[in-house]
Swiss-Prot record:
Source organism: Dasypus novemcinctus
Keyword Chaperone: no
Keywords noted in UniProt: Electron transport, Membrane, Mitochondrion, Mitochondrion inner membrane, NAD, Respiratory chain, Translocase, Transmembrane, Transmembrane helix, Transport, Ubiquinone
Gene name as annotated: MT-ND3
Coiled-coil segments on the chain, per record: none
Function: Core subunit of the mitochondrial membrane respiratory chain NADH dehydrogenase (Complex I) which catalyzes electron transfer from NADH through the respiratory chain, using ubiquinone as an electron acceptor. Essential for the catalytic activity of complex I.
Lineage: Eukaryota, Metazoa, Chordata, Craniata, Vertebrata
Gene3D superfamilies, alphabetized: NADH:ubiquinone/plastoquinone oxidoreductase, chain 3
Membrane disposition: Multi-pass membrane protein
Enzyme superclass (EC): translocase
Entry-linked Pfam families: Oxidored_q4
Family, per entry: Belongs to the complex I subunit 3 family.
Record GO biological process: mitochondrial electron transport, NADH to ubiquinone
MF (Gene Ontology): NADH dehydrogenase (ubiquinone) activity
Record protein name field: NADH-ubiquinone oxidoreductase chain 3
Length: 115
């Protein structure tokens, strides 16, 4: 019963915060707000340069493998449990999934910098 009350309170607060976030912003846009700010000077050229998709893909790949490290960090503490089978199974499935993702990324030439 306590868990149901906790879930209800969490969902209510989350919904309330989402509603407040949609209600509060003022969408007044004008040229000063939408122009880039460069230390008080007018920009010499276009301040909105196109972003290379390669950098974006490398950043996303880095974040995925960084998440792997974050998920595997609790493993030393999990080894102190009486039954290690669920922990080892989960860890091996996670590592296998990420290794398959890395192999797929490699085969699709997503890790090569030259085009």
């Amino acid at each position: 019963m306590n868990i149901m009350i906790t879930l209800f309170i969490n969902m209510s607060l989350a919904s309330l915060l989402v509603l407040i976030a949609f209600w509060l912003p003022q969408l007044n846009t004008y040229t000063e707000k939408s122009s880039p700010y460069e230390c008080g000077f007018d920009p010499m050229g276009s301040a909105r340069l196109p972003f290379s998709m390669k950098f974006f893909l490398v950043a996303i790949t880095f974040l995925l493998f960084d998440l792997e490290i974050a998920l595997l960090l609790p493993l030393p503490w999990a080894t102190q449990a009486n039954t290690m089978t669920p922990m080892l199974t989960t860890a091996l499935v996670l590592i296998l999934l990420l290794a398959l993702g890395l192999a797929y990324e490699w085969l699709q030439k997503g890790l090569e910098w030259n085009e």
